[in-house]
Regions:
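Generic serine detector
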Residues: 1, 15, 21, 39, ...
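Short beta-strand-to-loop junctions in surface cap/lid or active-site-entrance loops
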Residues: 1-8
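Serine-dependent carboxylesterase/thioesterase catalytic core
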Residues: 98-168
Length: 168
């Protein structure tokens, strides 16, 4: 699109449940395998191709920092590994994931000059993004959240969860 974007504007791609995704910048990604992991690589490449400044937020299926992956969705030799407190635990609580994602967004402000963010959340990434937006709004973050776009986010919960909890 021909729209001029502000210098500090960025898109942050947020992975869904049980995802493992490395942190990437517009200029740096993993050197082997999928550049931004299984669920974020195609979205990242599309956004970069359209001229957006796109970052992928780090996610790990469990606590801890992102580690290189083998097998399905493999990636490795990534440029930077961010600390656990900025890494979404994609199998943990939504609220804690939101806190970690908010910390990551504030880090983007401090380290990369990001002042405005458009979130793109895949699956549970939409819920993690919504939780981060709440944290950013209540902590006087210097980053303006412009939008949240979700892809397959379970806003109404899940049928399987309702069934498992005998709500059907």
């Amino acid at each position: 699109s021909g729209e001029k974007r502000p210098a500090g504007a960025a898109v942050v791609v947020v992975s869904g449940g049980d995802a493992v995704s490395p942190f990437t910048t517009p200029d740096q990604a993993c050197a082997t395998g999928l550049a931004a992991g299984n669920s974020d690589t195609a979205i990242r490449e599309y956004l970069l191709g359209k001229g957006y400044t796109a970052y992928t937020s780090p996610a790990m299926n469990g606590r801890g920092q992102v580690v290189d992956q083998q097998g399905f969705g493999a990636f490795g030799v990534c440029p930077v590994t961010l600390p656990e407190n900025m890494t979404v635990n994609s199998t943990g609580s939504i609220d804690t994931a939101g806190e970690h994602l908010a910390r990551f967004v504030n880090w983007l402000h401090d380290e990369k000059g990001v002042t405005e963010v458009d979130f793109v959340g895949h699956s549970m990434g939409g819920l993690y993004s919504r939780a981060a937006i709440r944290v950013l709004a209540t902590t006087d973050s210097k980053v303006k959240i412009r939008s949240l776009t979700t892809i397959g986010t379970p806003w109404q919960g899940s049928y399987l969860s309702d069934y498992a909890n005998d709500l059907m």
